[in-house]
Amino acid sequence: CSVGGNVVIAGVIPTPAVAYLVRQQGFDAGAVISASHNPYPDNGIKFFDGNGYKLPDEVEDELEKYVRQSADNELARPTGDGIGKIEFNSNLAHLYAHFVRHTIDTSLEGLTIVYDGANGAASSVGPEILSGLGAKVININVNPDGLNINHHCGSTHIEGLQVAVQQHNADLGIANDGDADRCLLVDEKGQVLDGDQIMLLCALKLKEEGKLKDDTVVGT
């Protein structure tokens, strides 16, 4: 704002939400302050372009170069009406939750799911999505205080979710990492399903429905 840009602050929301909202709301770019799956002191910045895609490495390098130069040389700053405006919009998280729910055509009615939010960005959105799809949701690690993100919880510390699933006789456990751009699953026996196994399950379902192009999955 100090150099003329207008900013909409969405609050604490998942990284994928920013990627979606940038395009859906017609923003020019998105920025996320995130420690991802790391402890809270390790924050970095992720940028998205106006289409919701990560910036190419060469563009990020240019941004870093610009920031370093700006630190050494005072920028010309606007005054008066030229200064950007700040808007706080707490509804953006709900818009993202609504979008996710409506991309899923399967009801979770009758399922008991333990959700581990890693005390992170999806601590509110995750339960909202799952309960909105009809599941009975048992929440753990959904009380972020700014310091406890990823601390012995979430997808990097799956043991607590394994125990909780069996304690509650749940059908499934879902664990996000701190910024909720990845997840692991735990089955009803407490066994962990990693990313490769999750992709396999999704691929088999898509193949069954005739939606898996060339019967091929590409992962990175």
Q: At which residue positions do the language-model features occur?
A:
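Alpha-helix capping and helix-loop boundary segments enriched in small/acidic/polar residues
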Residues: 9, 117, 148-153, 190-194, ...
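Solvent-exposed amphipathic alpha-helical surface segments
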Residues: 3, 70, 74, 209-210
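Structural motif
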Residues: 10-12, 33-34, 58, 116, ...
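Conserved beta-strand elements of the Class I
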Residues: 29, 112-114, 218
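N-terminal small/polar loop signature for handling phosphorylated ligands or for N-terminal nucleophile
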Residues: 1-42, 128-186
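Gly/Ser/Thr-enriched, mixed-charge loops and adjacent short helices
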Residues: 43-168
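Short alpha-helical
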Residues: 16, 121, 201
